[in-house]
Amino acid sequence: NFVVIFTDDQGYGDMSCNGHPTIHTPNLDRMAHQGQKWTQFYSSAPVCTPSRAALMTGRLPVRSGMASSKRVVLFPDSAGGLPQSEITVAEVLKDAGYKTAMVGKWHMGHLPRHLPITQGFDSYYGIPYSNDMDRDPSVKGNWVTTGKTSPWSVYRVPLLRNAEEIERPVNQSTITRRYTQEAVKFIKDNKENPFFLYLAHSMPHIPLYRSKKFEGKSLNGIYGDVISEIDWSVGQVLNTLRKQKLDKKTIVLFTSDNGPWEVFKTHG
């Protein structure tokens, strides 16, 4: 089995196993201690859409048309997406008999013909693009100018199940927890089958949100809280694999998509 856990804009030093003094990540530390820790690694692009296209296809994003000198990432008004002609890792594994699921941020085309279920995934649960998109223009001030987070309802980001919109705007303060629940359910439901799970968290891309359970969890403000919740999520996945006796036959990879963005006060 294969589990790929992908975070959005997380920095190399945002984990205690990489030396952060105030953000504690015991589950990621366990992965680093018990597994392999890769410290030299290239991302194919510094932004979301092309780096994800490269992950899914193993090809430079310019070869799949998922890179541009003008609009480097896809937006809610974009008509394009990852071409059907591209072969994804999900398609390869599905053809080999694997059950496949994508949970989280896709950002390779939000129209039905470009969603994960057309690219080799049996199921999809998540948001189709970045969590800061489709912002209500009537609301003034945001994390860039104030360092504070606007209510999640300001960002009219949809939550999809397969190709159906089930919530809009999605409650982003619960999204990490719900992604985790969906991932755990998929593992349990497919414990008798070989599977590929792609869990792509929306966080810690700004704006930042975390559940009430993790408010004040870190000494490093809301950014630290968000990383703490992601670490909890990793622990839930690892513990589920162990309880289902799948840990010895599952490869788990954790990585950020392309590293951190700019400096936004308490937002990373």
Regions found by a protein language model. Give the residues of each.
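Formylglycine-dependent sulfatase
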Residues: N1-G268
